[in-house]
Amino acid sequence: MPNQHTMASSNLLPVGSNISTWWNFGSMLLTCLALQTLTGFFLAIHYTANINLAFSSVTHIVRDVPYGWIMQNMHAIGASMFFICIYTHIARGLYYGLYLNKEVWLSGTALLIVLMATAFFGYVLPWGQMSFWAATVITNLLTAIPYMGPKLTTWFWGGFSINDPTLTRFFALHFILPFLIISLSSIHIMLLHNEGSNNPLGTNPDIDKIPFHPYHSYKDMFIITTMIATLFIIMSFMPNLFNDPENFSKANPLVTPQHIKPEWYFLFAYGILRSIPNKLGGTMALLMSVLILTTMPFTHTSHIRSLTFRPITQVVFWTFIATFITITWTATKPVEPPFILISQMASSMYFLFFIIHPLLGWVENKIMMINH
């Protein structure tokens, strides 16, 4: 289209006119990343990576450092915001068939794995009860690896149990991984702009494009302002909304919490891990809960890209979202009936989505052929 070339030559970045609010989460994630990097840097200045001093150094940041409470709360709540945005971003990708842009989808999945690792290392740093025991449970999964598992665990811990060397390396990893996230994000954005974003209809947007600025840039700014306002409201009035009460006590290896659980954004994976009564099987399921996303570009069978015009698959998609929430809820409960059965059923349904999705695409193709 002539106007598209004119826009491109004027550096106006032509974008499809019909992209909805679901397309704003990329810029929200970029804002979250900037906030996390900035607040993380100021927290790292005052933090001490030592098992005897870590807990008191976090207390010192909150109580004595000027505006330290803002930095600490913004970093902790910002992590939750980050995951709310990223899960919505992924759900949008699944719904609108954006995974067919393979390079973008696979780089995004790699980004998610690095992000989850970074968040896990960060959760251990305050050295509270839940930090210590969550680290013990998750790192212990390495022992499930046949033959080399125990040696690998000892090497990772830097000793025969979680101790000072473990905290030091977790801090080093938590500091370095965000730079990898920034690099991968740049690659992710470059790959996206190589082909251009899709739209809710799943059609070729070249026929109707408008300049990114001012139309979409103002929309981005509005949603970012809303997100930051929400962040400040939670930080001011409900700062401990996402915190675990156990983490207000210093780590004690001799006292086990009644119910060990990670942060809410890992509960879906933790629920899947717990639903399998076998260490290696559970570890494999835990890894697959995230890695299975990489199969989506290769198992798409429908002639239609987006779910906008696929009502049968829409039902399956929303069942998948409900399943995700159910697993998250059951993971907060103790391992006892009826939660064991609910967790196992929900975990089975979670993986079943990735099998049913391509089959339904094939069925829908057949229905359309009959109608034609």
From Swiss-Prot:
Keyword rRNA-binding: no
Needed co-factor(s): heme b
PANTHER family registered for this protein in UniProt: CYTOCHROME B (PTHR19271:SF16)
Location(s) in or outside the cell: Mitochondrion inner membrane
Molecular function, one GO term: ubiquinol-cytochrome-c reductase activity
Free-text remark on how the cofactor is bound: Binds 2 heme b groups non-covalently.
Name the UniProt record assigns to this protein: Cytochrome b
Known role: Component of the ubiquinol-cytochrome c reductase complex (complex III or cytochrome b-c1 complex) that is part of the mitochondrial respiratory chain. The b-c1 complex mediates electron transfer from ubiquinol to cytochrome c. Contributes to the generation of a proton gradient across the mitochondrial membrane that is then used for ATP synthesis.
Transmembrane segments: 25-45, 69-90, 105-125, 170-190, 218-238, 280-300, 312-332, 339-358
GO cellular component: mitochondrial inner membrane; respiratory chain complex III
One BP annotation, GO: mitochondrial electron transport, ubiquinol to cytochrome c
Binding site for heme b b562: H75, H174
Miscellaneous comment as given in the Swiss-Prot or TrEMBL entry: Heme 1 (or BL or b562) is low-potential and absorbs at about 562 nm, and heme 2 (or BH or b566) is high-potential and absorbs at about 566 nm.
UniProt keyword annotations, A-Z: Electron transport, Heme, Iron, Membrane, Metal-binding, Mitochondrion, Mitochondrion inner membrane, Respiratory chain, Transmembrane, Transmembrane helix, Transport, Ubiquinone
Subunit field text: The cytochrome bc1 complex contains 3 respiratory subunits (MT-CYB, CYC1 and UQCRFS1), 2 core proteins (UQCRC1 and UQCRC2) and probably 6 low-molecular weight proteins.
Gene that produces this protein: MT-CYB
Binding positions for a ubiquinone per the UniProt entry: H193
Presence of the UniProt keyword Cell membrane in the record: no
Binding site for heme b b566: H89, H188
One family name in Pfam for this protein: Cytochrom_B_C
Disulfide bonds: none
InterPro entries (UniProt xref): Cyt_b/b6_C, Cyt_b/b6_C_sf, Cyt_b/b6_N, Cytb/b6-like_sf, Cytochrome_b, Cytochrome_b_C_euk/bac, Cytochrome_b_N_euk/bac, Di-haem_cyt_TM
CDD domains on file: cytochrome_b_C (cd00290), Cytochrome_b_N (cd00284)
Its membrane topology: Multi-pass membrane protein
PROSITE patterns: CYTB_CTER, CYTB_NTER
Family (UniProt): Belongs to the cytochrome b family.
